[in-house]
Amino acid sequence: MRAMVFSEKGELAAQIATILRERYEIDIYTTSDSPLDSYGAKVVFRITGESLYVDNISNFLADRFKEKGYDFIAIGSSVMGREIASILSELLHLEAITEIMKLEEGNQVFITERFFFGGKTVIREESKARIFTFLPGLVDPMPVDSRSSKEEIKIDSPSTVNVVEKIEKPKGSVNLEKADIIVSAGRGIGKKEGLGIIQQLADIIHGEVGGSRPVCLDYHWLSEERQVGLSGKRVKPKIYIAVGISGQVQHIAGMRGSKTVIAINKDKNAPIFNECDYGIVGDLYTVIPKLIENLKK
C-alpha cells in the first residue's frame, strides 16, 4: 500500500515516516525547509507558493491523492494538519480519524488506536477511514541510510483567504516536549508565590517547570506554553514530578508517556496516586524544602 504523508512541521513528518515506512511505500509532502530525505520516503515533495493556506494546500493534496493513486493519507496532528484533514475528508468523500497513535491493517479495514475519555483509556477502532492524523511525539525520528528523491512543487492557485493583518505570537522560551525532567505545579500550590519553590526544585535537578490547566489558563500563574494536558502539551520526560496536582483525566492525558512519575499531594485520595510510580502524601511546603536540602548534599 502507498501512503501520502503531510505535515507543515518537518519533525512531525519525520516521525510519521518513521512509523509507516516499514509497512508502506510513502511520499512526504511538506511546506517545511527541514531536510527529510533520510526518513525512508520514496520522494519528498516540498510545497512552495506565495500564499499557502489550508484551502489551496488541501486542493493540491486532494488532486495529488487522486493522481498518484495513494491508498491513504497520514497527516501530522497540528492545528493546520487537523484543518487540512477535515477539508480533505470533504473533498475526497473519505472518512477521517484524528489524533491516532497506532495504525494497522485489518480485513479491508484499518485498525486504529487513540486516547478516549480524556486520555483515561484507549479506544481501538475498525473503520474504512482513509485519512488519519497522528499525534506528535509518538516516536523519535530515526534516519535510514538511503536517501529519498526530492522535488519542489509550486502552488500557483490563489487562496480564498484574505489576510488583513498578521500578529506574531511571541516565541516561547521553553519546549516541554523535549524536556527530560519536568516539575509541574497544580492548583494545590495555593498561590502564585508557591512557584518559587517549584522553580528551585526544577533548577537543582536541571528540569523545566510545567503546570496544570488551572495554573496556566485560569490563574495565569504560568504561561500557556507550559500547560501539560489534553488541551496543552503532551510530554514524555524521563521524570515527571506532579506537585499539588489532583490528577484529573485531562492532565493525565498530557503526561501519560512519562517514564517515571512522582506525585506530591497532601490528599491521600488524589487520583494522581493511581497514576504515579512514587507518591508522597504531605504538604508540598514541607516536603519540597526537605527534597531540596537533600539534593544539595
Residue ranges with predicted function:
Residues 1-297:
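N-terminal glycine-rich FAD/FM-binding segment characteristic of electron-transfer flavoproteins
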